[in-house]
Amino acid sequence: MKLTILILLVITSFCSCGILREKYAHKAIDVLTPMIGVPVVSKIVNNAAKQLVHKIAKNQQLCMFNKDVAGWCEKSCQQSAHQKGYCHGTKCKCGIPLNYK
């Protein structure tokens, strides 16, 4: 079980780096999660892993929780639109500040 979860974390990491596409990660999750002995736990891990991969895969410029973690959002907005970059959840938007705090 520990090895299966470790492999799932590696797959998620590859997906976040862009090495592995989301649909292939989901297929790998479908193959790996039945290896967990308890069916209920297997299904929960399957759903949680797919949601995690989806959230990480749609992440833009390392925006997390409205924070520009690596400064990539600001840099890409300066290069493309010459505007300040703002993180909206996991998405980067140029010139559109958050209207909530």
Swiss-Prot record:
<dbReference type="GO" id="GO:0090729">
    <property type="term" value="F:toxin activity"/>
</dbReference>
<dbReference type="GO" id="GO:0005576">
    <property type="term" value="C:extracellular region"/>
</dbReference>
<feature type="disulfide bond">
    <location>
        <begin position="63"/>
        <end position="87"/>
    </location>
</feature>
<keyword id="KW-0800">Toxin</keyword>
<keyword id="KW-0732">Signal</keyword>
<keyword id="KW-1220">Voltage-gated potassium channel impairing toxin</keyword>
<feature type="signal peptide">
    <location>
        <begin position="1"/>
        <end position="17"/>
    </location>
</feature>
<protein>
    <recommendedName>
        <fullName>Hg-scorpine-like-2</fullName>
    </recommendedName>
</protein>
<feature type="domain" description="BetaSPN-type CS-alpha/beta">
    <location>
        <begin position="60"/>
        <end position="100"/>
    </location>
</feature>
<dbReference type="Pfam" id="PF14866">
    <property type="entry name" value="Scorpion_toxin_alpha-beta"/>
</dbReference>
<comment type="function">
    <text>Inhibits voltage-gated potassium channels.</text>
</comment>
<keyword id="KW-1015">Disulfide bond</keyword>
<comment type="similarity">
    <text>Belongs to the long chain scorpion toxin family. Class 3 subfamily.</text>
</comment>
<feature type="disulfide bond">
    <location>
        <begin position="77"/>
        <end position="94"/>
    </location>
</feature>
<keyword id="KW-0964">Secreted</keyword>
<keyword id="KW-0872">Ion channel impairing toxin</keyword>
<feature type="disulfide bond">
    <location>
        <begin position="73"/>
        <end position="92"/>
    </location>
</feature>
<dbReference type="InterPro" id="IPR029237">
    <property type="entry name" value="Long_scorpion_toxin_alpha/beta"/>
</dbReference>
<keyword id="KW-0632">Potassium channel impairing toxin</keyword>
<dbReference type="GO" id="GO:0015459">
    <property type="term" value="F:potassium channel regulator activity"/>
</dbReference>
